[in-house]
A protein has these predicted regions:
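A conserved helix-loop-beta module that forms one wall/lid of the active-site cleft
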Residues: 21-27, 72-144
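Protein kinase-like catalytic core scaffold
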Residues: 132, 172, 195-196, 242, ...
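A short beta-strand motif that forms the metal-chelation/ATP-contact edge
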Residues: 187-189, 252-266
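ATP-binding N-terminal substructure of ATP-dependent carboxylate-amine bond-forming enzymes
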Residues: 1-83, 88
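Glycine-rich phosphate/pyrophosphate-binding beta-alpha loops
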Residues: 62, 141, 259-271
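Short acidic-glycine loop/turn motifs at beta-strand connectors
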Residues: 37-39, 189-193, 249-251
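Phosphate-binding site of ATP-dependent enzymes
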Residues: 146-234
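A long amphipathic alpha-helix within ATP-dependent nucleotide-binding catalytic cores
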Residues: 206-255, 276-297
């Protein structure tokens, strides 16, 4: 269906066909979920019974709605292997919650300020300096980010927000890491292994390195410290599959954000890796491991 048309969905369908697996695409908003039934958690999709799959690959990521998260939990309750689980997806979806969890574990993150009301300019200047970034707590594809290069731009933005009928409370303010301006490193992890890395560069004159925003990509060496940091970040959030974005700060690598359903068109272009095949192989291994651990019925 046109509703499911995307590079990633097409690649998953190709990989599943090569492996002889049945892959069915589902829109979580079209589900009806039932609890308290004798058969346990059940579901209807577009009015028809929809049995729990062996594996659910959750690909809604930062765009996950409450319904999408509910479907993930529902399928997990019904016995499906869910990659990634709802709690991990929800944490990664919230950039502030992600930074809090990483910082609490001692992992390097950019200096960040968050408050319910608009921050004091003096606080931002003292803690972050200029230029800085204002970011939505939930966002993707480089959207929801504003750069302030000087005090005038910052005052203008704060004035605009102050005059808004609904003052946004889902903003956090972050230092702009000058040494990584317009570039970052994306590491993809599957299971507890980093499978590859790419360097992302912003388009000329831009500062957002997202491939979806017109940036360029290139292969990046997956050095052990880089891989270890990405794997630890994904593990702290409980993610089986993740795209970990790292900034090259003067004092070392910093984790910018962690994505639970990373797009991989640019990643495959840069690395030559078959991401759907790697993910489906991992899912099959997880299913086999679960079957081996399941208690055998006595005759």
């Amino acid at each position: 269906r046109e509703h499911f048309a995307s590079y990633e969905n097409g690649r998953f369908q190709e990989a599943a066909a090569q492996l002889g697996l049945e892959l069915v695409l589902r829109d979580p908003e079209r589900y009806e979920l039932l609890l308290g039934e004798p058969a346990g958690p059940t579901a209807f999709y577009e009015g028809e019974p929809d049995p729990a799959p062996t594996v659910l690959l959750a690909r809604t990521g930062a765009l996950s709605t409450p319904m999408a998260l509910a479907v993930m939990r529902h399928r997990q309750l019904a016995g499906s292997l869910v990659l990634n689980r709802a709690a991990a997806v929800a944490c990664a979806q919230d950039k502030l919650a992600t930074l809090q969890r990483l910082a609490a574990a001692g992992l390097p993150v950019p200096r960040t300020v968050y408050c319910a009301r608009l921050p004091r300019p003096a606080l931002l200047d003292a803690r972050l300096g200029l230029p800085l970034l204002a970011k939505r707590n939930v966002g993707s594809y480089g959207l929801g980010i504003v750069r302030c290069d000087d005090a005038t731009q910052l005052d203008d933005l704060l004035g605009l927000l102050a005059g808004s009928p609904e003052r946004p409370t889902d903003l956090h303010w972050q230092e702009l890491v000058q040494s990584s301006l317009g570039r970052d490193v994306r590491v993809v992890t599957i299971g507890r292994r980093a499978v590859g890395a790419m360097l992302r560069r912003a388009r000329p004159g831009g500062y957002k390195a997202n491939f979806s925003s017109g940036g360029s990509v290139a292969h990046f060496p997956l050095a052990p410290p880089l891989a270890a940091l990405a794997v630890r970040a994904a593990g702290l959030l409980g993610l089986d599959v993740a795209g970990v974005d790292l900034l090259c700060a003067e004092q070392g690598l910093q984790i910018c954000e962690v994505n639970s359903a990373p797009g991989f068109r640019g990643f495959e272009q840069a690395t030559g890796l078959d991401v759907p095949r790697l993910l489906l192989d991992h899912a099959q291994e997880r299913v086999r491991l679960r079957e081996r651990r399941r208690p055998k019925e006595r005759p």
